[in-house]
Regions:
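Thiamine diphosphate
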Residues: 1-163
Length: 163
């Protein structure tokens, strides 16, 4: 069996979920080739939104989609999600308990070549303190496939941490 990056499994499973559920929309912050949401984008370009390097806007947009019955999957690096968009996650998604899936890639120190500005180890502690947030951290590609499917069954905010 070939071992894959967790984000590769995330992108593949997200595209499969997109076939099963037309209410799934995917938002990315100009990193779709890195987060692997480009797999979803190629199949469902009308349900994929590249917000650009504007993580706070992306999270707020996801909250808006959720209030209209869509199921947003927000994807970016853990640093930019938990770091830059913390207030929006806390106040716009978690307090009203909106059904938004936040999928943060490049967690920990796995992006060594990008330097300390792209590394995030405190995202787990930040996300775990927010009321109504479910936090899941996967260890490999197999567990990631399972987790992507399981979080789709959770009604409410989820933080999925990928390496």
């Amino acid at each position: 069996m070939e071992k894959k990056e967790t984000r590769q499994s995330y992108g593949e499973e997200l595209a499969i979920l997109g076939e099963k559920n037309q209410n799934i929309v995917v938002l990315d912050a100009d990193l779709s080739s890195a987060t692997k949401t480009d797999i979803f984008a190629k199949k469902f370009h009308d349900r994929f939104f590249d917000i650009g390097i504007a993580e706070q806007d992306m999270v707020s947009t996801a909250a808006g989609f959720a209030t209209c019955g869509k199921i947003p999957y927000v994807s970016t690096f853990a640093m930019f999600c938990a770091g830059r968009a913390y207030d929006q996650i806390r106040n716009s998604i978690c307090y009203p308990k909106l059904n938004v899936k936040i999928c943060a890639t490049h967690a920990g120190v796995t992006v060594g070549e990008d330097g300390a500005t792209h590394q995030m180890i405190e995202d787990l502690s930040l996300m775990r303190t927010i009321p109504n947030m479910t936090v899941i951290s996967t260890c490999d590609d197999i567990q990631t496939k399972w987790a992507v499917n399981e979080i789709s069954k959770i009604e409410g905010p989820v933080y999925l941490r990928l390496y």
